[in-house]
C-alpha cells in the first residue's frame, strides 16, 4: 500500500555508518538541498536533533532513535527527560515517535516506526510549528526594539 525506500542521509562529515540501503545521499551537500531533502521526504528516521526540528517545522513525519541525554556511571542511558530530542517531541506531543538507545541498542521494530510515520498528525504539527515561528518572530522584534 505504501511504497517507501530507506535512504542513508549524511551529516556534514558524510555517512560514517554501515547500512543495507540501496541509496545514499553523498556530500558535499548544500545546506538548502539538505533542508529540502528532509522537507520533501516521506519521513525522516534518525538520531540527530536538527533533522527532527526541520521535519517538525515542515510537518514531515519523523521518528527519533535517540541517543541524547545523560548516562550513569556504568554508561547506561537514563531516560530521565534530559534528551533534547525527547523534550522537543514531548512539546509536540509525539513521545511515541522516539525510542532511546542504551549501550548502542534499542528495542525497536520496523512496524513500530512505519505505524508512527503513517499516523503522524501532520496538520497538528504544522499548526504548532507555525505558532512557535510566530512566537519567535515576536520575541526577536522585542529584542531589536529594546536595543534601539
Residue map of PLM features:
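Active-site anion-handling motifs in enzyme catalytic cores
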Residues: 1-148
Amino acid at each position: 500500500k505504501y511504497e517507501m525506500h530507506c535512504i542513508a542521509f549524511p551529516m556534514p562529515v558524510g555517512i560514517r555508518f554501515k547500512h543495507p540501503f540501496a541509496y545514499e545521499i553523498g556530500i558535499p551537500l548544500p545546506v538548502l538541498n539538505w533542508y529540502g531533502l528532509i522537507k520533501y521526504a516521506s519521513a525522516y528516521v534518525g538520531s540527530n536533533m536538527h533533522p527532527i526540528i526541520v521535519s517538525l517545522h515542515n510537518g514531515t513525519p519523523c521518528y527519533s532513535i535517540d541517543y541524547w541525554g545523560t548516562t550513569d556511571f556504568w554508561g547506561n542511558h537514563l531516560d530521565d527527560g534530559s534528551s533534547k530530542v525527547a523534550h522537543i517531541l514531548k512539546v509536540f506531543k509525539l513521545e511515541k515517535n522516539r525510542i532511546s538507545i542504551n549501550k548502542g541498542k534499542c528495542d525497536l521494530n520496523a512496524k513500530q516506526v512505519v505505524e508512527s510515520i503513517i499516523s503522524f498528525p501532520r496538520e497538528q504539527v504544522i499548526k504548532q510549528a507555525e505558532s512557535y515561528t510566530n512566537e519567535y518572530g515576536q520575541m526577536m522584534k522585542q529584542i531589536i526594539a529594546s536595543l534601539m
